[in-house]
UniProtKB/Swiss-Prot annotation:
CDD domains per the UniProt record, alphabetical: GrpE
Organism field: Methanobrevibacter smithii (strain ATCC 35061 / DSM 861 / OCM 144 / PS)
Signal peptide annotation: none
Compartment(s) where it occurs, according to its Swiss-Prot or TrEMBL record: Cytoplasm
Protein name: Protein GrpE
Main location per the UniProt record: cytoplasm
Lineage, opening ranks: Archaea, Methanobacteriati, Methanobacteriota, Methanomada group, Methanobacteria
Protein family: Belongs to the GrpE family.
Entry's transmembrane regions: none
Keywords: Chaperone, Cytoplasm, Stress response
Length: 185
């Protein structure tokens, strides 16, 4: 009987161990499935990361190309900024050549030069060039450069007596100051 009891106890322990073993196998299988899922997710993340890196590299290359293209365009814009003005002056330049070649008398030459002067002045005016008023104006250091001072009884102190060289603005910006003689008493 003791043997039967001992054997029953061993059978019971074996059953319990078998159940624990089966539970552990199930748990191990479950953990292996979780690990496989984690590895799968990790691989997907690696692929996505690689895609983002590739995209980032392509965007960087595109941006560098964009910068180079824009730099070239900017240089071309600066290089050829005066092209419309040159085209407008070319007609007058060619007229001057013809006037010099074809003028037989001094009057013909003068008439041709006056016509050309008028055309050039019109072109420059259309481009926004304006003369700075000087003679009889109050001296303005932002528009005029005083080269000389003189005392003139007919002119108020601080006013311009004579314009020695014309000054100009281009679309409101002074590009050449008027050179003047100013009255100083």
């Amino acid at each position: 009987m003791a043997n039967d009891k001992n054997e029953d106890q061993k059978e019971e322990e074996t059953k319990t161990l078998q159940e624990k073993y089966d539970e552990l196998l199930e748990e191990l299988d479950s953990k292996n499935k979780e690990l496989a899922k984690i590895n799968e997710d990790l691989e997907k993340q690696k692929e996505e990361t690689q895609e983002y890196i590739s995209l980032s590299q392509r965007l960087q290359a595109d941006f560098e190309n964009f910068k180079k293209i824009n730099e070239k365009k900017s240089k071309d814009i600066i290089k050829f900024a005066n092209e419309p003005l040159i085209k407008n002056i070319l007609d007058s330049y060619e007229d001057l050549e013809r006037a010099l070649e074809n003028s037989k008398t001094e009057k013909e030459l003068r008439d041709g030069v006056e016509l050309i002067y008028s055309k050039i002045k019109d072109v420059l005016t259309k481009e926004g060039l304006e003369e700075i008023p000087a003679k009889g104006e109050k001296f303005d250091p932002f528009k005029h450069e005083a080269l000389m001072v003189a005392n003139d009884e007919n002119v108020e102190n601080g006013y311009i007596i004579d314009e020695l060289m014309k000054g100009y603005t281009l679309k409101g910006k002074v590009i050449k100051y008027s050179k003047v003689r100013v009255c100083k008493k």
